């Protein structure tokens, strides 16, 4: 059955591909010459890797296509003749390269769709929990590669060809898993990829069997004496070999498509890893499933490489450039597979302080394949600037140890580690447990750039030998910002948070957009705050943040400058500095109360006043909101005895180091009912809401002088200044250190740190 017929058997696939071909007006062409197009493109002897090659292949295809169309004009079907004329006109209008690439890409899409549909029929089947147990793989065709051979270690660099292809025979699928392993429903996407790889391997089995027969016939021909049928036998062998080459090319095309799918899954995993740097959920365990795909692909390409080498030993003609080219393609594919499987699985800290220890690890997703683990290489690490990383990646710099030493932008201690293979989980990795950045070289800054905007990356690299040729592999970490002092941390996290949230999956290091929609930014802020504090932001919270960012200007987009560079109106700090300080205050001093919903937090003063005045409980109703004017401050708004709203001066982390927030609230008898952060809930009594957070206070002790120091013990309590009882309708007051006379027993909330209340005197 042709590929298009298989597509047509699924209405959704047919509609999808019809729309794809109709984009260029090629649907009629695809329908009219379906089998010919499939055979012609899939049997290409040269896969175009350069622009010149692509143009030559496309022109040849265009020429053959026109000849094929002209040959159909002799048909008696008048409608067909008319369609041929139209198709010939189409070919004249579209460039040869555009025509060829669109059809070739279409075939790759069709291959993926057909395989996905075949997987859907078996997707409900259970698979063993152990990702390395292949005994229950559904049988797709009459032939299957021996499971033990599929994932076996290729310890020899030059295995015997027949063994390299692997024993291929009928396998009964019992569908019964080992009881000790348990049964689970696998992740469908990765299972589909694994299923497609297995299916392609099974189909390649037919090619392997044909190759064995060809080798036997070739050996018989060489050993036999002259025979009158020798010429016919020779021609037959040539035809058999050509058919095998065609099958191999098709298999290689399948392999390329499958490799692309696995790389896509790995890129998604890396993207999720970056999102996890902001606190997003991340299933690190899915990397084991991706490794399984890499190992299966390595087995696939190893079988193919062995088969090509065996086929080249059947020398029927002097020169076979197409077979030589196929060998080069397969060897390069194996090399690319090995290189792409080298990743950073445990990222270093993305805000990295000099002279501070940190850890990271890299992993090679080929496991025990190729036998590299028997002689594990040593992985080295250097730090690169953004510019150096771009040059290395975009120019595809040839890597050697001598040139890399000059690429480093700093000095890292303990920057080498030998890879280790863990037999129990098939992980082949190198752990850097005690690295330390001693020095950093910075680039010259331009304009408003600061050291906190400058991105670096750790560059991990090693060298190994595979099948007698040397392979150098490398990988980059996520971007890091290097600081030398703690006060550089907030802006550094702005750089990292923006990059993790909005980086494209594929990009040059470390290019990033300078503006995003509010919808995008709100998700990033919510993830960041929620992961740090244990409770997500509400819709009202996010609306308030939107007002803060947009100010008077209403736009769909939020720029990088608005986010962390430009001070907010009438303030000396940026939005990010304000947001980060609140996040830190909440995490360090109010975490339990925030999680319990006791703190409304992100609400403007006007709305706070309105909500409190509308409360049915009236006097004594209060809420906690984050200060607009104070970095890392929280303030209390409450309804006073006159029915007006009073705003207390904000408290900061420095205040909570003396007395925690819950105890401060307990001291204020003017606070009775907590206004709920949930608009659908009712106010809660103060002691019910905050009681679990109160600290245990000791009973007053008799007035006793310490015989050594001569001092009397004292306790601290919070009171509200009398001048605050009339309510405040102005903006939240700035933090002010005011003196007071001890005689009246009252003091301002903002002056708490400078005053001691001696209760026992």
UniProtKB/Swiss-Prot annotation:
InterPro entries the UniProt entry points to: p53-like_TF_DNA-bd_sf, SH2, SH2_dom_sf, STAT, STAT_linker, STAT_N_sf, STAT_TF_alpha, STAT_TF_coiled-coil
GO molecular function, one term: DNA-binding transcription activator activity, RNA polymerase II-specific
SH2 domain boundaries: 594-658
GO cellular component, one term: nucleus
Swiss-Prot/TrEMBL keywords: Activator, Cytoplasm, Developmental protein, DNA-binding, Nucleus, Phosphoprotein, SH2 domain, Transcription, Transcription regulation
Pfam families: SH2 (PF00017), STAT_alpha (PF01017), STAT_bind (PF02864), STAT_int (PF02865), STAT_linker (PF21354)
Null allele phenotype: Exibits aberrant expression of the pair rule gene even-skipped at the cellular blastoderm stage, leading to larval segmentation defects.
UniProt keyword rRNA-binding, yes or no: no
Subcellular location: Cytoplasm; Nucleus
Residues recorded as bearing Phosphotyrosine in the entry: 711
Listed GO biological process terms: antiviral innate immune response; blastoderm segmentation; border follicle cell migration; cell dedifferentiation; cell surface receptor signaling pathway via JAK-STAT; cell surface receptor signaling pathway via STAT; cellular response to lipopolysaccharide; cellular response to X-ray
Record note on modification: Tyrosine phosphorylated by hopscotch. Phosphorylation is required for DNA-binding activity and dimerization.
Assembly: Forms a homodimer or a heterodimer with a related family member.
Entry function: Might play a role in signal transduction and activation of transcription. Plays an important role in the segmental pattern formation in the early embryo by activating specific stripes of pair rule gene expression in early development as part of the Janus kinase-STAT pathway. Might play a role in male germline stem cell maintenance.
PANTHER family assigned: SIGNAL TRANSDUCER AND ACTIVATOR OF TRANSCRIPTION
Name the record gives this protein: Signal transducer and transcription activator
Organism the protein comes from: Drosophila melanogaster
